[in-house]
Amino acid sequence: MRRRAGDVLFVLGAAVLAAAFIRGAQTAADDAAAGQASARILTQFYADMERTADEASDGAADEAADALPAPPAAAASQAAPECIGALVIPAIALALPVLADWSDGNLELAPCRQFGAPETDDLVIAGHNYRSQFSRLGELCAGDALTLTDREGRSRTYTVAETATVAPDDVAAVQSAAYPLVLYTCTPGAKARVAVFCNYA
């Protein structure tokens, strides 16, 4: 009887370890895919921004050029999610696109604007706790600099005012914060959220 109970416990333990291994492997694969997607979107964002700047400096476009079809890069960017800017955080060696619309699918690719806008000084950006996204937000300290560059090439520089842990259901803590920029992500296990509140530099 004891041997049978031991065998059952052994099998259960092995099943739990296997499930943890599979979950860890899936998370690592999701993280890698998100990192690759973010890199592609960021590269496209900078290419689009440069193209827009070139077009603006060239003045009015030639009518014959307007009749030509869009180059392949422009056509590809139409299929990608809309990107409102590039977020650079030197203190944690991070450069990421910020997608315009929050959704579960978009969050798998890159951090997303969840509420507000840079122009209204109430931007809230949510990102996954992937190594390729916001897993290191909790390492930021007061005074660390962040830069958000929009599609027109305008940069806004912020500094971290404070970092806090908030309850996972406390939406008001990030949405109603009196800061022009808030970044947040889940803690491991999604039991809480790490929120970084930023002022203009």
PLM region spans:
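Solvent-exposed, non-transmembrane regions of membrane-associated and secreted proteins
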Residues: R3-A201
